[in-house]
UniProtKB/Swiss-Prot annotation:
Pathway: Protein modification; protein ubiquitination
Gene Ontology MF annotations: molecular adaptor activity
GO CC terms: anaphase-promoting complex
Main subcellular location: nucleus
Protein name: Anaphase-promoting complex subunit 1
Subunit-level organization: The APC/C is composed of at least 10 subunits.
Position of the signal peptide: none
Species of origin: Arabidopsis thaliana
Keyword Chloroplast in record: no
PC repeats: 1089-1116, 1156-1194, 1256-1293, 1320-1354
GO BP annotations listed: anaphase-promoting complex-dependent catabolic process; cell division; embryo development ending in seed dormancy; embryo sac development; metaphase/anaphase transition of mitotic cell cycle; plant ovule development; protein K11-linked ubiquitination
Family (UniProt): Belongs to the APC1 family.
Length: 1678
């Protein structure tokens, strides 16, 4: 019969979406536009809509619309991309980067490349490129010829593979439907004549940032640069490395295969000759010609890929001959490389004037990287045909109403109306998947959908399974029957009709075998030439001469529709074979549907069809198998007519049960359908996944992408130690989530749930997030998710993946994505301050009140107290003397703590406000540094919340007049690393303002942002402020010493750790010199800054074998006052004109140079344990030495010695006392109140040395245990702080005899105060971020002291505020690190010289006090309950590694908490009965704990005797409560008898699971399902099955006559149902198998002994009670 006729689904008149969008925007229409449609999968944006549903046609395709040479609009989201200049060519390409797509636009002298995220790269072109073409290995650029290049450039027809590319067309009118090539004027050639021989005619671009490389051609085993400009490219594939070209001179088409060449030698030497040596540059692309054909006068108008019997073919549309020629391809895999060649036996042609590839018949199937592509062909007679390879499937026609609607719309005459009704299709275009544009003969274009995939999921599954399982010739027969159906024009009208139509195909074969037309043999009258053409010799020989002209018309006669009216024996045999293989394919679908609880109705429909097929084929076992599942079919389906035994049907449930009982390797794989074990078969992938999970769970091992048993399985990456863990990885790899697990029958899912339960408690730490979601461990899933999420795209993909693995109806109870803890804050928290004047004032500390601090401190008011103490937005309480006669001016002068609000509050005078007199002469100078410090704090608070600070934001906040506030803000932003957004012009604009504070803040901020980078531009800007770096010819600049000091430290931070020789020599000279100014008071501060900088440059590098390190150290020792026999001074790099050597006579002024030299040596030899330097920095051991060395220098030496000998620092009182020399110990021990016989000078020197040594040791202790919260260090430092506090003013009882008493009589109070506050700061450094209450009470006491209680000044108040801030660092969320860089920053911050006033920068620049920020790190840990998304308390067990002071230690913490330093952190475990245990190992790879939250998941157990109460704990839904009452009521037992029978099949697997657990084949999970429950389930089922009195009679009749009970009058047909349940429960074989076993026993055994042992041997899986019944039926005499 002729091919089936199907009606096209017309979606409407076609109009580019770009025009629709422009019309919406109100733009006037214009014809100068171009567009093409493509599949969104090309750019990774494939929609989830049904690929063949006409309603979603326009949603599943994207459009590239270009207008006015400047604008691109992609898709339906209107993503615009602008480019400048005229464009010639555009296409999508992945540039050899996998799935990432790039839009490549060819312009006059450049190639513009856009990615999907909006980034643009422009690639300059040195020669004229006339077209670009996509290849899997990159973008192919075809260059113009050397002489007289063409005046116009064709467009690359973008390959319509997947419908992704259709040629861009210039639309002169809407009705112009045929593709046209575009031409454009060519710019002048940019390449010179001498370079022309080395140029290739085709270039390949693989990276937008690289230059295009030449391509090569392989000829006779040699590689030659491709320079044939006559080979014009006409098509390339973006999926397969194929290119087609046309040579006009030779009238020849060629097909080329692109291949990579790997080698290491250059090819430039051979450019002149054009011959490439044996090895060329790595990753070059060569082309190998695999097919050629001559005879075509013009190039093929269209080339595309299609498939024919699962083989890719290249199709050429030759318009001059009106033919579509197809050439088959074959692939060969050699050394993991795929090589392409032409398959000689696949070459055919059909008549056509237009053609395009479409996805219609097998949309779910892929042939390698390609989808299954059919061909839509427009014949010369304007008929539209659908081909699957060379087989014509159907003819498509336009609906009749289409012409009527067009004619009626125009309102013309009847004659015109009749013309409209006779519509003819004149052209095809814009094919995307199953949609295409059809041009008709009235200048109209319609978008049409080609219906192929049925709407019925069951029909679609069956057709797809048949396509996968049938042999190619049988599948062609099936297609002819399917598409040749006379009712196919009604396809899609009803889901039920689609299924009935499919069933009718098989039923017609069953009733009347269909015969297929075959090619008639040639008669004797045919010529010898025609006989030769049909011979096998011609088919073989034509491979080498296969051209377009070699196709004889006689060969086309074989490409005709099948005819079902002609019968033959061969056709009858094909029909039977079709039915046999179809039975196997459909049975595989049947077994897969049995694994899905939601497709019971489809299972019944399929069983009816399978029963008819099995009956037709006399497959009695199959027929009996289906009737057992659906017993009522026995009344409608008769028995088989033959008595011969038939095949045993595969039984997936039997395989699962045997797998549970005996293991995977002992099962019979004949129980699995062949399709399930086949790789790439997506139709039965549901059953394949279940089989693979069971296989892995019971001993099968992965071997690549398959298991050792041959079952395909994708396994997610991760470690495993047992089969259960491997099963979880397999489920994660197959994306088999909890929702899919719910769809499985309960008994089948039971072993998989057992595996989940076994691994839930302690899964490995390297699993993917989806594996943890499977386990219900969303806590671990989110930890993994947040550790690896680096972009919003990744976050959305991960969210989608995690949600897909979860249970939809449980997402509101167990969310897998929770909000960040930062968003769970206390927005309305207000400060509670009884002494505040205005509670609503903003003080900049609102951010410290969040969920973390609330959880950590609870209702504790310490944070409120911290906020009150550090508040700078309110007047400060001023304690006044009791004498009321003191003037206001004196009270104002007593105010020594400068803050933003320079006002005081007098509680004794009814909280009167006292403002600072604005007439004070230096009022602005007094406010400068307080405003600077306050702005730094604001910058530190602002930057983390801002997330990203832009250059524009900084410039907009720049004041009109420079001030200290903006200077401090710049410094604060720089400490957070945000000043790298400034460019050089911004930096020099700040410098030209000539404002000291701004310059200081900017230099230090830039150095912090570019710390350790040695960035040349920043270094140049900093060295500008160091006059010693100037050359002799430079004009002298008057740079304040303050700026020079800041510049020196900034240089040190910029060059940190580099040991840059030139910079170190410069800084060494600066320690011994003063600045260009004459401010003698600031010389020490300048030298200290140079020492800081030198130490930073050579940080920890003192032990390196550097050439000039010895001389540098010797000179530093000279600055310390060491005695040297010879001069080792290193000459300066510059002239001494701008600085003079600081000397006192013939030696250096040690009072100036010693601090800087000590600091430099300390940082250079930090943690190096250098005994040499340690001995050089000795402590005075005699009275004479004590009088010669300043006491504060002794403190610096103690700090230096301890930081060098890092490992010797110990938090004990004995260690601190060991720092004190014997002469000092002896002198201090003899102190008495009545000592009159000791020299006063001697005693004062001893006490001064003692106090400074103790303070230095405490500072060393604070740095050694910075941020550790070490209890011993805290107690020790606290005791020394209380000791000095009692010496200043006795407040408590004597702490004991451990400390000497009465030292305050021999030392000034200022020294004691300074040492006290240095110890206090050290104590806060140890307890940084902890908020320790004991330390805070001490700080609050010190903060409340006035001048009457102690030496209260600017420096001491700064120390207390600094210590308070350290104690609550980052609101308790940050702490200090002890790496070299952090210690250096802390040492600079804690330099033991406190300022005496707001403007005191003589010895230490106040801005350096903020460098502690660079020593902080976030080590806080917070736990979030994944069920509620709220922070919770969780107990942790923290394990730290063994150190020199401690062995490996475990301790407990309650979150939120601060973890130990990551260098010593080994393991973190979540413990306690409330949460699932979780263990994080940090030995081999440190995870960034500061950037992720550790999530805790609670598993609460609710015990209740009341069902109502139990349900009410999680739901108040009345329907759910009623359902629980019904199921748990005792009267439900009667109904249970019927419900349990539906679960008989699944219960068998559940019982096998129970056996696997009891025998140890599955690891016990602690009572996941109680074995007594399963045993009671077995007993109850057997009681139900044995209660029927008629069962034995029906069973006897079934065994003897294979007859099912006939109970037509009974509505429920109870006897049939009970018999089927009995047969399945006791594994009764089919009667044919039983009879075969009986006959075998009777033939072998002649005696009258019992046949039960032999029956047991032949029927091993059958229950013993059934075997006894068989014995009684067939052996009654026994």
């Amino acid at each position: 019969m002729p091919p089936g006729v199907r009606q096209l689904t017309v979606l409407g008149k076609f109009k580019p979406f770009g025009l629709i969008a422009e019309a919406t925007d109100g733009k006037s229409p214009d014809d100068s536009y171009q567009y093409f449609l493509f599949d969104p999968e090309l750019t990774g944006e494939r929609d989830d809509a049904d690929g063949n549903d006409a309603n979603f046609s326009r949603q599943r395709e994207h459009e590239l619309f270009i207008r006015d040479n400047c604008n691109v609009r992609k898709g339906y989201a209107l993503v615009e991309a602008n480019f400048i200049g005229y464009w010639y060519n555009a296409c999508w390409s992945n540039l050899g980067r996998g799935t990432e797509a790039f839009l490549c636009v060819l312009q006059i002298a450049c190639l513009t490349i856009y990615n999907t995220s909006g980034e643009v790269v422009s690639v300059p072109l040195m020669r004229t490129v006339k077209s670009i073409w996509p290849l899997p290995c990159g973008l192919l650029l075809e260059q113009a010829g050397e002489v007289n290049p063409p005046s116009h450039v064709p467009f690359s027809p973008v390959s319509p593979i997947l419908g992704s590319r259709e040629m861009l067309r210039q639309r002169k009118e809407v009705g112009n439907s045929s593709p046209q090539n575009f031409h454009s004027p060519v710019a002048h050639d940019l390449i010179s004549k001498r370079d022309m021989p080395c140029m290739s005619s085709h270039l390949i671009l693989r990276d937008p940032l690289e230059e295009p490389g030449p391509t090569y051609v392989e000829e006779r085993g040699k590689l030659t640069i491709m320079k044939d400009y006559d080979e014009r490219t006409i098509w390339t594939s973006d999926r397969l490395p194929l290119m087609t070209s046309y040579n006009k001179g030779k009238m020849q088409h060629s097909v080329w295969a692109a291949e990579f060449i790997e080698s290491n030698l250059e090819a430039s030497a051979s450019c002149s000759s054009g011959i490439v040596p044996d090895a060329v540059l790595s990753k070059r692309v060569s082309f190998r010609r695999i097919w050629q054909a001559k005879g075509a006068k013009k190039a093929a108008s269209k080339v595309f890929l299609a498939t024919d019997n699962s083989v890719p073919v290249i199709c050429f549309l030759i318009l001059e001959q009106k033919k579509l020629l197809s050439v088959g391809l074959q692939t060969v895999e050699i050394n993991n490389e795929i090589l392409f060649d032409v398959k000689p036996d696949i070459s055919w042609s059909v008549s056509a004037i237009a053609a395009a590839p479409v996805v219609v018949t097998r949309s779910q199937v892929k042939i390698g990287l390609l989808p299954h592509l059919d061909i839509i062909v427009l014949s010369p007679e304007n008929d539209l045909f659908l081909y699957s390879g060379k087989q014509c499937l159907c003819r498509y026609v336009l609906p009749s109403w289409l012409g009527e609607s067009i004619g009626s719309g125009d309102g013309e005459s009847a004659k015109t109306d009749s013309g409209f009704r006779n519509l003819k299709i004149t052209g095809l275009s814009d094919a995307v998947l199953g949609s295409i544009n059809l041009s008709v003969n009235h200048s109209q274009i319609f978008r049409c959908a080609l219906t192929g995939k049925p709407s019925s999921s069951l029909a679609n599954d069956c057709i797809a399974a048949i396509a996968e399982g049938l042999r190619s010739d049988l599948y062609s027969l099936f297609l002819s029957l399917l598409w040749g159906d006379g009712h196919s024009d009604l396809q899609g009208s009803s889901i039920h009709f689609e299924w009935e139509a499919l069933c009718n195909i098989f039923l017609e074969i069953c009733q009347k075998p269909t015969v297929v037309h075959r090619k008639q043999p040639k008669t004797a009258s045919e010529s010898s030439w025609e006989f030769l053409l049909i011979s096998k010799f011609h088919k073989t020989y034509s491979r080498f001469h296969n051209g377009i002209t070699s196709i004889n018309r006689l060969d086309l006669e074989g490409i005709v529709p099948f005819d079902s009216k002609i019968c033959s024996e061969e056709t009858l045999g094909s029909s039977c074979e079709l039915m046999v293989q179809s039975l196997d394919c459909l049975h595989a679908v049947y077994e897969s549907l049995k694994m899905d609880n939601l497709r019971k109705q489809d299972l019944h429909h399929l069983a009816v069809l399978l029963c008819n097929i099995a009956k037709f084929l006399d497959e009695k076992c199959y027929l009996d198998y289906y009737i057992r599942d659906f017993p009522r079919l026995s009344t409608t389906i008769g028995a088989c007519t033959t008595l011969s035994s038939s095949r045993k049907p595969p039984n997936l449930f039997r395989w699962l049960e045997n797998c549970l009982r005996r293991g995977c390797l002992s099962t019979n794989f004949d129980d699995l359908p062949d399709l399930i074990r086949r790789d790439g078969c997506s139709i039965v992938s549901w059953a394949r996944k279940v089989v693979s999970f069971y296989s892995v769970l019971f001993g099968d091992k992965p071997e690549g992408r398959t298991l050792s048993s041959g079952v395909p399985c994708n396994i997610a990456p991760g470690s495993y130690s047992c089969n259960e863990e491997l099963t979880i990885l397999a489920m994660a790899g197959e994306r088999f989530g909890l929702h899919q697990l719910d769809l499985l029958p309960s008994g089948v899912s039971l072993p998989l749930r057992h595996a989940l339960d076994s691994c839930r408690e302690s899964p490995p730490a390297d699993w993917p997030a989806i594996a943890y979601v499977l386990l219900g461990r969303e806590d671990m899933a989110l930890s993994v998710f947040r550790n690896f999420s680096s972009s919003k795209e990744f976050e959305m993909q991960s969210n989608t993946s995690l949600i897909s693995m979860s249970i939809p109806y449980m997402l509101h109870l167990h969310p897998v994505i929770v909000p960040s803890s930062e968003s769970i804050g206390l927005e309305n928290t207000k400060i509670e301050d009884t002494n505040s004047v205005d509670g609503s004032v903003i003080d900049g500390m609102e951010h410290i009140f969040n969920s973390y601090t609330q959880l950590r401190y609870g209702r504790d008011l310490r944070l409120n107290e911290v906020r009150r103490l550090l508040c700078s937005a309110r007047p400060v309480v001023v304690q006044t003397a009791a004498n009321p006669t003191i003037s206001d001016q004196e009270q104002q002068q007593a105010f020594t703590v400068p803050k933003l609000v320079l006002a005081g509050r007098l509680p004794s005078q009814q909280n009167a406000i006292v403002n600072l007199d604005p007439n004070i002469r230096n009022i602005q100078e007094l406010k400068t540094w307080p405003e600077f410090h306050n702005a730094v704090a604001a910058g530190l608070r602002l930057a983390p919340l801002q997330g990203k600070v832009s250059r524009t934001w900084i410039r907009y906040n720049k004041p009109g007049e420079p001030n200290a506030v903006h200077a401090g803000l710049l410094f604060g932003l720089g400490l957070q690393g945000y000043l790298h957004v400034l460019n050089l012009s911004d930096i020099y604009q700040y410098f030209t303002q000539d404002h000291e504070s701004t310059t200081v803040g900017l230099m230090l901020g830039l150095a912090a942002s570019y710390r350790g980078t040695m960035q040349p531009d920043i270094a140049k800007a900093l060295f500008f402020h160091v006059p010693a770096r100037y050359q002799a010819s430079y004009t002298e600049f008057e740079i304040p010493t303050l700026l020079q000091s800041a510049a020196l430290v900034s240089v040190g931070m910029l060059f940190e750790g580099s040991a840059h020789q030139q910079t170190m020599q410069l800084l060494l000279g600066e320690i011994g010199r003063r600045s260009a100014g004459d401010n003698v008071l600031e010389r020490e501060g300048y030298a200290v800054s140079a020492g800081f900088s030198l130490g930073l440059v050579a940080l920890g590098r003192g032990g390196d074998a550097l050439g000039s390190m010895d001389s540098l150290v010797n000179r530093l020792l000279l600055y310390l006052g060491a005695k040297e026999e010879r001069s080792i001074l290193v000459p300066s790099l510059e002239d001494h004109r701008s600085a003079a050597q600081i000397t006192d006579g013939s030696t250096s002024n040690v009072d100036i140079t010693a601090p800087g030299a000590i600091i430099a040596l300390t940082l250079m030899y930090l943690k190096t344990e250098s005994e040499v330097i340690f001995s050089k920095l000795s402590i005075p051991q005699t009275h004479y030495d004590l009088e010669c060395v300043r006491p504060d220098f002794i403190m610096l030496r103690v700090i230096a010695r301890n930081l060098i000998m890092w490992s010797r620092i110990c938090p004990t009182c004995d260690w601190i006392q060991s720092q004190v020399p014997e002469v000092v110990k002896n002198g201090i021990s003899q102190l008495r109140d009545d000592m009159d016989n000791m020299y006063e000078v001697d005693v004062e020197a001893l006490v001064q040395a003692y106090v400074n040594i103790v303070a230095g040791a405490c500072i060393s202790l604070g740095l050694r245990f910075a941020g550790t919260r070490d209890g011993n260090a805290r107690d020790l430092l606290n005791s020394y702080a209380l000791y000095l506090l009692n010496e200043i003013k006795p407040l408590s009882a004597t702490p004991g005899n451990a400390f000497p008493r009465g030292i305050s009589k021999f030392v000034d109070r200022g020294t004691l105060e300074m040492c006290l506050y240095l110890i206090i700061i050290s104590l806060s450094v140890v307890m940084a971020g902890s908020g320790d209450l004991q330390v805070f009470r001490l700080l609050r006491f010190l903060r409340s002291r006035n001048s009457a209680d102690g030496h209260a000044n600017y420096g001491t108040q700064m120390a207390v505020s600094l210590a308070t801030g350290f104690l609550f660092l980052g609101g308790g969320m940050r702490t200090f690190s002890t790496n070299n860089g952090s210690l250096a920053m802390l040492l600079i911050t804690l330099y033991p010289r406190l300022p005496s006033g707001p403007n005191d920068n003589r010895c230490h620049l106040q801005a350096f006090r903020h460098l502690y920020v660079l020593a902080t790190e976030a080590r806080w840990l917070q736990t979030i309950d994944v069920d509620s998304g709220l922070p919770v308390y969780a107990p942790l067990e923290v394990t730290v590694k063994e150190t020199k002071l401690y062995s490996e230690t475990k301790f407990c913490e309650i979150t939120p908490c601060i973890l130990p330093e990551r260098a010593i952190l080994k393991r973190i475990c979540v413990c306690g009965p409330r949460y699932w245990p979780q263990q994080i190992e940090l030995v081999f790879g440190l995870r960034t704990l500061g950037e992720s939250n550790l999530i805790a998941n609670s598993h609460r157990e609710l015990d209740s005797d009341s069902v109502d109460h139990l349900v009410s704990t999680f739901s108040s839904d009345p329907s759910l409560i009623a359902f629980a009452q019904l199921c748990c009521d005792k009267s439900w037992n009667n109904s249970f008898d019927f419900l349990i029978l539906d679960l008989i099949l699944w219960s068998q697997v559940a019982l096998a699971y129970n056996e696997a657990v009891s025998t140890g084949r599955l690891a016990s999970s602690g009572g996941f399902v109680q074995s007594i429950f399963l045993a009671s389930l077995r007993k109850r089922c057997e009681e139900v099955l044995n209660c029927s009195t008629e069962l034995k009679i029906n069973l006897r009749n079934y065994l003897t006559s294979e007859a099912w009970p006939y109970d037509k009058n009974s509505k429920l047909q109870k006897d049939i149902i009970i018999l089927s349940w009995y047969l399945k429960w006791f594994n009764v074989p089919s009667p044919s198998i039983i009879k075969a076993a009986v006959e075998k026993i009777k033939s072998k055994s002649k005696n009258s002994t019992s046949a039960i042992p032999l029956l047991r041997l032949l029927l091993p899986n059958t229950h013993i009670s059934v075997i006894g019944e068989i014995d009684r039926v067939f052996f009654p005499s026994n």
